[in-house]
Amino acid sequence: MSINIEQAIIHEISQDSQGQLRCRLRPQPLLNSQAVEMMLEELHQTYTSKSGKGFGYFGIHGDDGEANPAFSNALQEYRAGDLGFVEFTGQASKLLQEELAKYDFSQGGFLLMSCYTSMASDFLFVALLSAKSSMTVLDDMELSQNNHLDLSNIQLAARIDLTEWQADKDSRKYISFIRGRAGRKVADFFLDFMGCVEGVNTKAQNKTLMNAVEDFVASSELTKEERQQCRNKVFEYCSERFDEGADIEIKDLADELADQGMESFYDFARGGSYELDEEFPADKSTLRQLKKFSGTGGGVTISFDGGHLGQRVIYDPISDTLLIKGVPANLKDQLDRRLKGE
């Protein structure tokens, strides 16, 4: 396993017959069974691989609007040993119930909370899971409908890096969370119940890094192939950090490039007007532009490796055209068959 589970528990928030939300609290933690280990390992892997996560910190009431400190206060008591895990998670469930009650769309769910260790850091994982209906075949070959937790499609989840939170009170990225789809802030209530305030604009930092890399290779005496190698190396490094759940470190990245004969990136990035943090989370979708060009519009979707620009793919900005040399075989076959049909 990639995680070492300390404790885990599930509470339920559901509507009663009058439509009021109620908490059903579990009186003791889940047993460390194989089922629990498999569930948390799957959730850990699924969550870590989610791209486009937001990052924040526990807000201070007044300085950060109406940030509710109740969750962080209870967590602090739990970490100090003044509050048990069951009591802490029970208080958290009540806080979530109160927050959910403010919205008409909520029907509740199963609140999973787990403390575990991974990569020498302590984490608190918090997720509101829903049940999903499925069909199974019984021993007598009859169909039966049952419900199971939908682990592969988590939309309301956050993970608190407890080690970073307690070691660096000025950090603004020790809480990560899944953003709502298509930019909608459907998860606002989930952040509000924890008193979480967004602190680091991950996409902006990754976009700035990409711009710094492009400016760096443009100002260097590298050949075209070496420039693309530099872009690929940056993407490779950042992808590895993303997969490990670790931050991009500008100094570390610069050392990686220096090992490839591309010196002085650190001074270039820090000396310009890029305003890059020393460390920030990776966003794979943004940095993928270092390796690929892609775009969609007007019913046309185009994607190609960056190394093909100027060779197999020629761009003419004056005529606003792309010339593709060597049409992919499967596309060529479709086009040829369409022309024959006409």
Swiss-Prot record:
Keywords: Cytoplasm. One of its GO terms (molecular function) is single-stranded RNA binding. It is found in: Cytoplasm, Nucleoid. Belongs to the YejK family. HAMAP family: NdpA (MF_00730). It holds the Pfam family NA37. This is Nucleoid-associated protein Shewana3_2426. InterPro entries: Nucleoid_associated_NdpA. GO terms for cellular component: bacterial nucleoid; cytoplasm. The keyword Signal does not apply. Its main location: cytoplasm.
